[in-house]
Amino acid sequence: LLQLLMGFTRLDNAPQLGMVAIIGMSVCDVAFNLVAVCALGLGLWGMGAATALAYCVAVAICCTHFASKRNTLRLVNPLPHLGKLSSVLKIGLPDSLTRVTVMLRTFTFNWLLLVVASGAAVAALSMLSSVNSFASSVTIGVGQTATLLCGIFFGEEDRAALKATLRTGLRMGLMLSCALCAAVFVFAPQVVGLFGLDGEAAAFGVVAVRAFMLCVPIDLINQLFVSYYQSTGNVRAASAIAVGQSGLFAVLFALCTVWTWGAVGVWMSFLVGEAITLALQVVVACVLWKRRRAKAGSVDVAGTLATGLPAPAGPVRASLLDKMMYLPETFQVDWLADQAFSCKPNIESVVECSRNVAAWCQAQGIDGRRAYLIPLAVEEMASNAVEYGFAKTKHPAIDVKLILKRDGTLMLRMRDNGAPFNPMDLDLSAADPYSAVGIRMLRQGVRGVEYQNTVGLNNVVVTLSVSA
C-alpha cells in the first residue's frame, strides 16, 4: 500500500511526500522500537509490532496529499480499465519478486543464525532491518525519482536526457549514500545502542551494521537500474536484478560460508550479493552490446545499399552506461536531426533562444511557414513562463528541443519547472487578436499537442507535419 501511495503522489506532483514518508517511517521505526524494547520490554514481538506501526505512519503521511488543494486524483470505477491489469501486473513484477525474495532471505538467515550462532544474532538481524529502512530513504528516493523522469524521456525517445538522468542519479545518490554509510559505520555502536541491544546481541549488531552499510552504495546502483528498466519496459532485466540483489546471491553465499565463518557469513552476504548482481549486470550488458553491434552492422550496410540513406546509429564510442541502457533498435531510428536549446529566465535570453531556433530551422531546410511559426511559438511560451511561471521557483530553467524526422515531421518539445500551465489552454477569446500569434497558429496548424506536468515539470510536445 505504501509503494502504491508513493507512486500516486509522485505522479500528482508531490514527489517530496514519498521521501518525507520514508524518513518519517524510519524515525518512527527507531522511536517505536525503543519504546517497545526499552520501556515496555516486549522483545522481538514488540520490535515487529513497532516496525508495522511505523509503516502505518508512512501510509498516513502519503494520505495527507488527498486532502490537499494540489490533489487531482479522484476515485473512479475500475471495471472499464480491467484490460490494463495485465500490463500493470507485468510492470510491478520486479517489486513483487523483491518482496518474495526478501521474505525467503529473512527466513533462511534467521534459521542459519539460530543454528550457527544464537538468539542474540537473530535479534541483531531484526535490528538490521530497521537500519535498512533508514538507509533505503536514499536508495528508494533516487530510484523512484528516476522512474518518473526516465519514463518521460523514454516516451520522447530522448537518449541524451535518459543518460543524463542516470548519471545525475548515480552521482547524487552515491554522494548521499557514501556520506550516510560513513556516518553510520563510524557510529555503529551508538546506532546499535539506540535499539536497546547489549552484551552479545550488541556485539553482533555492531559487526552486522558495519558490514551491511558497505553494500548500500552498490544497492543504490542496482536499485537505480531496476527503476530505469521498469520505466523503459525492460521487465526481464528489472526482475533479474531484483531477485539477485534482494537475496538470491546473498543466500547462496551465506549457505556456503556460514558453517566456517559463523554469523559473519550472514553479515557479509549482503555486500557479496549486491556486488555479484552488479558485476553480472556489467558482464551481460557488454556481451549483449557486442552481439547487438555486430548484428546491427550487417543490417545497416544492407539498408544503406538498398535505400541510399545513411543508417541511424547509436553512440559510436559507447560508454558502459550506454551499454547498460538496453535501448530498443527502433529508438530514434526515424530522427534525421535534432538540437537542444536552453535559455535563462529572462526576456533577453528568450529572444536569443528564438533566434537560435530560427537559425536551426533555416539550416535544416524547414519550409517557410514552420520556420516562422516555431521560433515565434517558442518565444511566446518561454516569455509566458518567465513573466508568470517562476514566481515561486528557486532555480528556474527552460529547455527547448527540436526534432526533424525523416518523413519531414517537425517536433517541438518545451520543458520548464515553473507553475503548472498548459499554453494550449490559454484563453485567447477576449485577448488582443494580434497577441500570442504563435500560439494561435499552433492551435490551428498542428498535428498533435501533448501536455503533462510531472515531478514539477511542464512538458509540452507539439508535432507539425509537412503540410502544416
Question: Which residues fall in each region the model found?
Answer:
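Short alpha-helical transmembrane segments in multi-pass integral membrane proteins
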Residues: L1, C28, V37-L93, C150-C215, ...
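Short runs within selected transmembrane alpha-helices of multi-pass transporters and secretion channels
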Residues: L1-L11, G18-D29, M47-C62, I140-G143, ...
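Small-residue-rich hydrophobic transmembrane alpha-helices
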Residues: L2-G18, V122-A182, V186, L220-G233, ...
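Helix-terminus/linker motif at the lipid-water interface of multi-pass membrane proteins
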Residues: V35-L42, M103-S130, F134, I152, ...
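Flexible, glycine-/charge-rich segments associated with ATP-binding catalytic modules
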Residues: D300-F341, Q444-A468
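Conserved short strand/loop->alpha-helix "switch" segment adjacent to the catalytic nucleotide/phosphoryl-transfer site
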Residues: V357-E379
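A conserved short beta-strand within the histidine kinase catalytic ATPase domain
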Residues: H395-I403
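Glycine-rich/acidic phosphate-handling loop/turn and adjacent ATP-lid/helix
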Residues: M411-A436
